Every structure is written in C-alpha cells, then in structure tokens.
C-alpha cells in the first residue's frame, strides 16, 4: 500500500505545495474537507491520556482549527497548551509558534536506533490500516462491523499520534487532513449494506492517508521537510472538528454551502462575462484597486487593535507584578490559592498576548498581507499599463483610418471632377471649327493629364485606406487578445490576494481563539473552586499552625511590705553597670579588660558594633575648639586641636560630620579593649556620605556648594543640591557624583580646554616627549584591561558615553579616571581625537606618495602571485615589500618630531593589540582599515567626501597595515618607551645588545601571548607592569623576522617610578650573567630626555648592535 505512486493521490482533493506558496500559514481549503457532520459512533471512546500530557509533547506545534473530534478521541494531540487546571501547568502556546522555533529534542532521529524505532512505528501504523481495511470491507457480520471498525481506527490513529508526538516535524497539513477524511469516511460508511460507492471512497481515503504519511516520513528521513506544511497551533477546544467549519452537526451538508457553490462561477465564465460587457477590464482593474485599498484598511485596523491589546497585556503584567507580592505575602488568607492562580493566569495571558501580537506583526497577518498588497499593486499597475498601451494603439489606428478614409473620399471627388472636365473639353473641341483645333487640343491634353494625376492619387488614397483598415483590424484583434490576457491576469492576482487574505484571517482568528478560548474555562474553574471554600477555613488552619505554649496560670496574692534599709537603688545600678553580662552603652564599651573580663568576647563584639554605628552621627555643635578622640593604647578619651582645612570654613553641619568621621576612624583604628576592629575601612563622612560616589569622586573632599557654578560632569549650571571640592574647587551636581570621572588634583582645577580639533603641535607642547596626554591615557587603559577584548577599535562605543568622556577630558585633562569606562568608549575617544585633528598624524604632504607606494605594493603583490601560481616561492613579493618598507622608513624620518613620537607610540600599542589577535580578532589588516582614514587622509576639499578619498581607502589601510606589520623595520632606530610614562622615566625595555656586543636572536612569537608595557603615570593610580618574555630564535625567513622586530626586546623588569639607576643584571643568551643594566642607563638627576639606542643591523636573520663602549651618557 505504501509503495504506490503518489500520482494516484491527485485523484483526491488535497493541498499541493504550489497552492500553498502564497499563504503564510497554509490551511486546508473547503474542497478538501468532508461535507457531512455525522453523529459520533458509540464505540469510539476517548483514551485515558490527559490533555496536559498530550500537550507536553506537542506544545510547540501548530495545527488547524479543523481537526476532527474523532482524531481527538483516537488520541491525537489537539491542543498546543495544557488545559487550565488547578495545577499551574499552563504554558503559552506561542512559545514556539513558528517552524523556526520547533523543539530540537526529538526533531530528527539521532541515530540508527531512532530510525529503527521510527520504521517500526510506521510498520505498526501500516498494520493498523490493513486491519481497518479488512474490518470495514468484510462481507459478514454487517451490523457488528461498526464498533470493530471504530476500534481498529482508534488503534491506527493512536500509533500515528505517538509517532507525531515523538517527531513533531511529521505533523503536516496533508497527513492530518487525510486523517480527518478517513475518520469521516469510517463514520459515514453504511455497514448495513454493501454500497460500492462507500467502498471506493473508503479505499481512496485509506490510500490518501497511507501515501501522505509515507511521503512525509520519507522527506523527514531525507531532511527535506517543508516548513510551510507545518500546522498552526489549534485552539484548546477538543470538540472542534473539520466538519464544524460548515456549521452545526446535521445529516446532510448545509444549504448555504450548496447555494454558495451554485452562485460561484468558474474562472472561465467570469472572464467571458467581462469580455462580453463594455468596460470589463476597467471594472476588473477598479475592483483590484479597491481590493488593495481594502487590504490597507485591514492592516491598519489590525495594527491598531493589536497595539491596544499589547498595551492591555503589558498593563496587566505590570499590575500582576506589582500586586502579586503583596497578595501572596501573608499565608492562610481566604481564597489565597484561587487568587494566586488567577494572578498566574493573568501573567500567562499577558505573555501570550504579547507573543501573539509579535507573531501577528511578523509572521501570520501584517507582514504577509503587506507584502501581498505591494505585489498586488505592482501587478495591477503592470496590467493596467499593458491594457492602456493596447488601447492607445487601437486609438491611433482608428485615427489613421479616419484620416485615410477622408483623404480617399477627397481624392475620388477630385478624380470625378477631372473626368467631367475632360469630357466637357472633348465636347467643346468637337463643337468648334477646324481653325481652333490647336488651342482646344492643348487644353484637352492638359485636362487629360490632370485627370490621370487625380486617378493616380485616388488609387494611392484607396491603398492607404485599405492599409489603415487592415491595421485597425489588427489592433482591434490585439486589443481583444490583451483584454483576455489582462482579465485572466487580474483574476489570478485577485485570487492570490484572496488566498492570502483568507490564510491570514484564518491564522489571525485561530490565534485569537487560541488566546481567548482558555479564559472562560479558567473563570469557570476558579468559580467552581471558590464554591468549595468554607468560610473560616484558612483562619482555622492559621490558628492550628501557631506554635505557642499554653498560657501560664497567673495568681494574684497580697504581699505585705517588708522594709530593708541596706538596699540602695544607686548602689544597685552602679554595681550592675560593671556586670559583664549586663554591660551596655559607653560604660561597657570603655570598661578595661580586667573589669569587663576577656571571656565575654562575643557580647563585647556586639556592643562594639552598636557603638560603631553611633559614632557616625554628628557630634553636638557645642564642641567647637577641640574634638574628642581615642587613645588607642589606653582606651581613654582625650582632646586635641582641630586642624584647619585648606579651603573655606565649613558650616556647623559639615563640622559635625567631619568630627563624626574622625571619631569613627578612631574607633575603627583600634578597639577599646586593644583588639583590632572588624571593619578597617571607615564609612564615608560628610554631607554626601549617603550618595553612591564613583571612584574618581571619592578622591575629592566634598562640601556643599554655596554659589552657582557649572557642573564639570554634565556641563550644566548647578544651583541647588550641588557639591564642591575644597581642594580643586570642582563643582558637580549631587546626582553626577555617581558618574564623575575627574579625579582631584589637589590644586585649583583649570578652565575647560579645547582639546578635540586643536592643532596637534599645540597639544604636544604640554608633554616632554611630544605625545598628547589623551593618547597616553587611552592607550594605557586599553592595554591594562582590554588587550583581549574582542573587536577592540572595531566596535564603536555608546555615543552618549563617548561624548561625556570627551567632555571629561576637556574639563579634567589628565585627571580623568578611566577604570570604570567601557573599553570600546575609550577606543572611540582615541579614534575621535585623532580623526578631528586639523592635520592628520601623517601630514598631508606625505599622502600622495604613501598612497602611490601602497598602489605599487598591491600591484607588485598581484603580479608576484600571478607569476608564482603553481610554483613555490615569494621572493618577488618580499622584495616589493622590502622596497616599500625602505621608502616608508625614509618618509617617516621626515615627519615632525611630535608627530613621529606619537605615531611610534601608537604603532607600538597596535602591535600589542595584534599580538592578542587570537582573542581580540583584530589583525593588522583590520587595524589598517580602522586607522587608515584616521591617520592618513588627503587635504580637505570643498566636496564633503571626494571620490578619490573613497577609492584610496584600501591604499590607506595598506599603508597602516604595513607600518604595523613591519614596525621594526620602519622604526628600527627608535628607543622603546613604556606606554603611559609622562615624566620620561627611563624604563628602556628591550635592549638587543649587551656590553660585549652579544647578538640576541629574533623572537618569532611571544610565549604567553602579549607583553604589556609598564606605566608610571602621575595622573592616574593605575599601573601597567611589564611581562618579560624570554628571547627565542627561529628559522623563519628574514622578512618575517623583521616584521616582528619589536618582539625581540629583552624583558627588563623595573620597579614602578624608579628615579635611580637600576642595579639589575641582564641574563645572557646562554643563561650566563650578562652586563649590568646600569651600563645602559644615563644620569638620572634632572634628566628628562632619553639617550638614543645604538644602531641595530640585520645579519643572517639576527639583530646585532654595538658594544657598551660606544654608548655615552647624556646630561641635560
């Protein structure tokens, strides 16, 4: 049965993939559904499987609303969601509403065992169908066949349901439509008599489900499952069937269906009617136009309705989140479980509605209908244009025909006149005498010539007229052909749009029904559950769970007065104050160890905690000249003079806060009993101690702002709730203290600096080495914590944060704190600074020569690749690269000193970025693309973006890539500086020669991935430490070694902020002690310049240098 050809299936009404192409959610059409709603057979009972269990396996599938109730009775999972019950097992059916979100578990067979299991299930299903066929078609036991057939049908469908629940991708439209048809045929079969038509229809339905299921399994095993055939999520009504789409359950088909079929004309008759009537094409085009407007109105209506529903769902979710905690806070409240479940249901309903709105917008309604409308309009305009073109051709032919007809008549009249004149001339010649014959003959000849010309013109006009008549007939026929074609195309477009509207409408109302169908059930369930509650039940439960002892029996007796003279309240209290068990307050905290006892450590610790909380309160204002402190050695209180602050006098409240901070620090520094405190760090004091301060804000001594000033963080004026630093006079909003990025410089902060867009030569004057502070600051922070960040310099930062960081640099200069900023924001600031320079780092005058070098290099590389294709070797490409590197070295030497120093500093940093290429994914090529237009750009012109600059982007990137890769060759004579050193500290790392001229081999790759430089910055408390890597030799080519020249530097670990000559000893190549580092150092007293390194040369793939005798100290 499963081996028959699928073409036999074409005899039965089915859904082809071609018809489903225009539908976003293909549904079964009316021609494929059974037309009768027969009564249920008593022998087909629903299985014991609960709906929630069924939904657990197929909760993410979509199914049509038309699945038969008998499929449900046979075990088909009809609902994508569990029925609302008292257990909270409801899940939103839209959790996987699209085929792309189907569950991965069980989607495809994992191995041979799963395929074997699937094939075994298919065999069981085939056996069930064979049994069903034998049971239905047997000739004996006519009346007893009905319950037996229903039992066989249920068994076969249960097997099918198990397969579909295990492999959800088998749940297709064709399979379940065929199942519904088979169920209808089994119900409608007349078992009392052998009707041949019933047998043929039953066999056809059986063949249909067999072929459909086998084809679906085959496509599933081959991985060719069409996602468009997956079913939509059905409503949760298990009684819904395919027959219910036609109305109530009557014995025959409803009358409205028959009337609809009688009134519906075939497409050919519709076209014939429009062809025969006048203006048929125009009427069809107008209908198509109205239909496009109708689709637009539908989309607008559904969009507004969906927006309202989404707002309602979000508002409902917000109400549930706000009220759930307060409602469920107290246990044992009446009907608490009911309202808890109602809250859960409302939350799930809100989630479902939000997801349903998203599905409507992107999958099922708005997007498909919008695309269909656009396509509908495009096709309508094309058909309209072709129809109007054919009409214009016919009109032109008719106009030509009228002109030709008029000309033909005129020529014929002229010919008749000419003939009459000739006849008249002949008569006159015959009536005259022989003496006048010469003049008459001449006139006669002339009139004959005119008559001949008129005749020729009449014949030409007749020919033209006949041609125009033929052309008009041709154009008329072409217009008729165009009319037929246009009507057929218009009807096709309209039917496609109808199908899209139908599918979208079915999907929409199915989705809405699925969302709203559980609501009445939920409310009814909550109502019935509420009826079961007995008043006072929860109160009794609450009282029963109280863990209280029995109330003691209290007796009231008279006690006579007894006098005791030795008793004294004062002595009693004073004695109790030294009791270590009852000690509390300052007396207990200040008691000496011998009185308080050392065994009571835990109580004393508790009392210290209470005391520590109290000392943060402001002291009384009456204490003006002295402050109360603690002597950490004896625990006694003493008085000391208050030190005056460097700023203006603070208010009394600030004085109290400062005194409280001092006492708190005294209490925190040592315990009263001589023990270490628990919390060594004191709480922040002052008027802003309760505000979350940033790292930079904690470096300021803040007080309340007295006069209006401009906030250095947000660049707006501060009038109220402002803070001011006593030392640097920085003003800031109270709320801006949480994000303040400017540290305290312990001197008055200067005014705002125009940093971005400033001339580079002016910016470089502020630093001794010519590298602007913003470049050092950003590079140091990136190397400290962002060398491994993926996409550094390629990923842009957040625009608002970048603007605030730029503003902080202009306000605070080198005092900006970057430890809390995003690495991408910092890199964006650096790129923005370099990009906004009036003249780029590589001057304008080098642009054309550098671009020419890049062009020549790319051309030589392409020629070398073409020449070396099919053979080994790349010497020509290496030679071209070496030539370009040599020319780059010469050009870079002509750069201004500050530009060269900054470029050298930046390229060293980019080399460290490249060393971490495996982590940050930033190759030299990527960095060249990022920094090419930034460091190298042409002189600006009147045009916004010139075409040449766009063409030169690859060449700019090539130049920067070459500078990064061959950095060691281009800048081989440059000394190595530690990034971030702003005082010119002599941290010369990477010397390649020893005192006796020892040759160090080149290093191919860093062993531990990267080598970060040391930073001793006077404007930031962050330091970068050198990671020393041992030198290693390799056998690679000389060019590749030279491209990693800077990796050959020996790691010399130097203490931070070293201001004296180092006495460390270098290690030689073979592990033996090398020369002392002091031989390479210059005099450090008042020395702010560096001695240049000796010249390095390439000999046999190794770097050699001069001896230490060639190096002389330089004094400044």
Swiss-Prot record:
Biased composition (Low complexity): 643-652
ATP-binding recorded as keyword: no
Gene3D superfamilies attached to this UniProt entry: Arfaptin homology (AH) domain/BAR domain (1.20.1270.60), Rho GTPase activation protein (1.10.555.10)
Principal place of residence: cytoplasm
Keywords, in A-Z order: Cell membrane, Cell projection, Coiled coil, Cytoplasm, GTPase activation, Membrane, Metal-binding, Phosphoprotein, Zinc, Zinc-finger
Domain spans labelled Rho-GAP: 758-971
Residue ranges, annotated region (Disordered): 1-72, 422-457, 569-658, 1004-1035, 1050-1116
GO aspect biological process, one term: signal transduction
Residues that span the membrane, as ranges: none
SUPFAM superfamilies for this protein: BAR/IMD domain-like (SSF103657), Cysteine-rich domain (SSF57889), GTPase activation domain, GAP (SSF48350)
Site feature (Arginine finger) residues: 794
Cysteines paired by S-S bonds: none
Compositional bias (Basic and acidic residues): 448-457
Record's GO cellular component terms: cytoplasm; ruffle membrane
Coiled coil: 375-498
Subcellular localization(s) per the UniProt record: Cytoplasm; Cell projection, Ruffle membrane
InterPro entries associated with the record: AH/BAR_dom_sf, C1-like_sf, F_BAR, FCH_dom, GMIP/FCHO2-like_FCH, PE/DAG-bd, RHG29_45_N, Rho_GTPase_activation_prot
Residue(s) carrying Phosphoserine: 23, 72, 92, 98, 568, 577, 591, 618, 946, 1017, 1020, 1022
Pfam families named in the record: GMIP-like_FCH, RHG29_45_N, RhoGAP
Signal peptide: none
Zinc finger (Phorbol-ester/DAG-type): 699-744
Domain notes: Rho-GAP domain is able to regulate RhoGTPase activity, actin cytoskeleton and cell spreading. However N-terminally BAR domain plays an autoinhibitory role.
PANTHER family: RHO GTPASE-ACTIVATING PROTEIN 45, SPERMATHECAL PHYSIOLOGY VARIANT
Job of this protein: Contains a GTPase activator for the Rho-type GTPases (RhoGAP) domain that would be able to negatively regulate the actin cytoskeleton as well as cell spreading. However, also contains N-terminally a BAR-domin which is able to play an autoinhibitory effect on this RhoGAP activity.
The protein's name in its UniProt record: Rho GTPase-activating protein 45
Organism: Mus musculus
């Amino acid at each position: 049965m499963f081996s028959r050809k699928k073409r036999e299936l074409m005899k039965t009404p089915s859904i082809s993939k071609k018809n489903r192409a225009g539908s976003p959610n293909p549904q079964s059409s009316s021609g494929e559904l059974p037309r009768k709603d027969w009564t249920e057979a008593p022998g087909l009972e629903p299985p014991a499987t609960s709906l929630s269990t069924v939904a657990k396996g197929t909760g993410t599938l979509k199914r049509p609303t038309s699945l038969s109730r008998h499929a449900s009775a046979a075990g088909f999972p009809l609902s994508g969601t569990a029925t609302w019950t008292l257990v909270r097992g409801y899940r939103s059916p839209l959790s996987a509403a699209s085929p792309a979100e189907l569950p991965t578990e069980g989607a495809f067979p994992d191995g041979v065992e799963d395929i074997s299991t699937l094939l075994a299930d298919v065999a069981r299903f085939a056996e069930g169908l064979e049994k069903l066929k034998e049971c239905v078609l047997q000739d004996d036991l006519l009346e007893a066949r009905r319950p037996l057939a229903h039992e066989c049908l249920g068994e076969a469908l249960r097997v099918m349901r198990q397969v579909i629940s295990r492999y959800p991708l088998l749940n297709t439209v064709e399979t379940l439509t065929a199942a519904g048809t088979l169920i209808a045929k089994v119900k409608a079969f007349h078992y009392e008599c052998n009707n041949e038509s019933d047998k043929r229809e039953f066999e056809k339905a059986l063949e249909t489900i067999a072929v459909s299921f086998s084809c679906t399994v085959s496509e599933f095993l081959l991985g060719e499952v069409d996602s468009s055939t997956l079913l939509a999520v059905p409503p949760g009504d298990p009684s819904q069937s395919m027959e219910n789409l036609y109305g109530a359950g009557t014995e025959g088909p409803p009358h409205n269906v028959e009337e609809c079929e009688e009134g519906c004309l075939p497409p050919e008759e519709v076209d014939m009617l429009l062809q025969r009537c006048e203006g048929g094409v125009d009427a069809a085009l107008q209908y198509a136009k109205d239909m496009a407007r109708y689709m637009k109105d539908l989309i607008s209506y559904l969009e507004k309705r969906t927006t309202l529903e989404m707002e309602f769902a979000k508002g409902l979710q917000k109400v549930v989140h706000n009220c759930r905690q307060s409602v469920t806070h107290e246990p044992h409240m009446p009907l608490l479980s009911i309202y808890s479940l109602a809250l859960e249901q409302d939350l799930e309903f809100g989630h479902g509605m939000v997801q349903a709105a998203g599905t409507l917008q992107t999958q099922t309604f708005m997007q498909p209908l919008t695309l269909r409308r656009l396509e509908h309009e495009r096709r309508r305009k094309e058909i309209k244009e072709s129809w109007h073109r054919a009409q214009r051709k016919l009109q032109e032919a008719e106009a030509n025909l009228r002109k030709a007809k008029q000309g033909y008549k005129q020529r014929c009249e002229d010919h008749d006149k000419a003939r009459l004149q000739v006849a008249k001339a002949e008569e006159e010649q015959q009536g005259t005498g022989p003496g006048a014959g010469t003049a008459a003959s001449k006139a006669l000849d002339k009139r004959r010539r005119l008559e001949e010309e008129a005749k020729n013109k009449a014949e030409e006009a007749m020919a033209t007229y006949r041609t125009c008549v033929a052309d008009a007939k041709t154009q008329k026929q072409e217009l008729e052909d165009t009319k037929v074609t246009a009507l057929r195309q218009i009807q096709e477009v309209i039917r496609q749009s109808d199908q899209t509207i139908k599918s979208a409408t079915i999907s929409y109302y199915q989705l809405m029904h699925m969302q709203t169908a559980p609501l009445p059930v939920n409310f009814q369930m909550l109502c019935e559950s509420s009826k079961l509650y007995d008043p006072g039940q929860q109160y009794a439960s609450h009282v029963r769970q109280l863990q209280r002892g029995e109330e003691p029996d209290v007796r009231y007796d008279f006690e006579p007065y007894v006098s005791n003279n030795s008793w004294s309240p004062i002595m009693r209290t004073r004695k109790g104050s030294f009791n270590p068990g009852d000690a509390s307050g300052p007396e207990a905290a200040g008691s000496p160890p011998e009185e308080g006892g050392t065994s009571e450590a835990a109580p004393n610790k508790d009392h210290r905690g209470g005391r520590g909380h109290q000392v943060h309160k402001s002291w009384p204002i009456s204490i003006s000249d002295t402050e109360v402190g603690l002597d950490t050695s004896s625990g006694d209180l003493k008085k000391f003079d208050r030190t005056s602050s460097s700023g203006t006098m603070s208010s009394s409240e600030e004085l109290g806060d400062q005194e409280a901070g001092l006492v708190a620090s005294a209490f925190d520094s040592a315990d009263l009993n001589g023990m270490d405190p628990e919390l060594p760090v004191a709480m922040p004091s002052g008027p802003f101690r309760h505000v979350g301060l940033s790292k930079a804000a904690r470096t300021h001594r803040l007080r309340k702002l007295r006069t209006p000033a401009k906030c250095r963080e947000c660049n707006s004026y501060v009038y109220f709730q402002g803070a001011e630093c006593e030392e640097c006079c920085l003003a800031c909003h109270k709320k801006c203290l949480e994000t303040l990025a400017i540290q305290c410089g312990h001197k008055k902060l200067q005014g705002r600096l125009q940093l971005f867009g400033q001339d580079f030569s002016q910016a470089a004057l502020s630093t001794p080495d010519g590298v602007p502070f913003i470049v050092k600051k950003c590079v140091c922070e990136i190397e400290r914590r962002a060398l491994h960040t993926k996409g550094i310099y390629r990923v842009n930062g957040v625009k608002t944060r970048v603007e605030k960081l730029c503003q902080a640099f202009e306000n605070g200069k080198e005092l900006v704190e970057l430890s809390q900023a995003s690495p991408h924001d910092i890199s964006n600031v650096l790129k923005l600074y370099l990009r906004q320079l009036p003249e780029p780092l590589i001057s304008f005058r080098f642009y054309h020569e550098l671009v020419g070098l890049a062009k020549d290099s790319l051309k030589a590389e392409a020629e070398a690749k073409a020449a070396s294709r099919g053979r080994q070797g790349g010497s020509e490409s290496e030679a071209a690269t070496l030539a370009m590197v040599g020319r780059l070295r010469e050009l870079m030497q002509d750069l201004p000193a500050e530009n060269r120093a900054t470029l050298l500093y930046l390229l060293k940093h980019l080399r460290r970025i490249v060393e971490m290429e495996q982590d940050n994914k930033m190759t030299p090529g990527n960095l060249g693309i990022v920094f090419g237009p930034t460091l190298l750009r042409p002189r600006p012109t009147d045009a916004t973006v010139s075409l040449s600059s766009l063409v030169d982007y690859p060449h700019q990137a090539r130049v920067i890539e070459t500078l990064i890769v061959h950095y060691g060759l281009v800048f081989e004579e440059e000394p190595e500086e530690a990034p971030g050193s702003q005082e010119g500290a002599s941290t010369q790392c990477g010397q390649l020669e020893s005192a006796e001229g020892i040759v160090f081999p080149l290093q191919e790759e860093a062993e531990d991935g990267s080598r970060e430089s040391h930073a001793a910055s006077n404007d930031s408390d962050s330091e970068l430490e050198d990671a020393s890597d041992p030198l290693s030799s390799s056998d690679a080519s000389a060019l590749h070694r030279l491209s990693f020249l800077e990796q050959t530097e020996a790691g010399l670990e130097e203490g931070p902020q070293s201001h004296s000559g180092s006495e460390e000893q270098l290690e030689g190549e073979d592990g033996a002690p090398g020369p002392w580092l002091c031989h390479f150092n210059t005099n450090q007293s008042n020395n702010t310049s560096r001695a240049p390194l000796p010249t390095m040369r390439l000999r046999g793939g190794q770097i050699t240098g001069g001896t230490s005798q060639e190096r002389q100290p330089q004094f400044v």
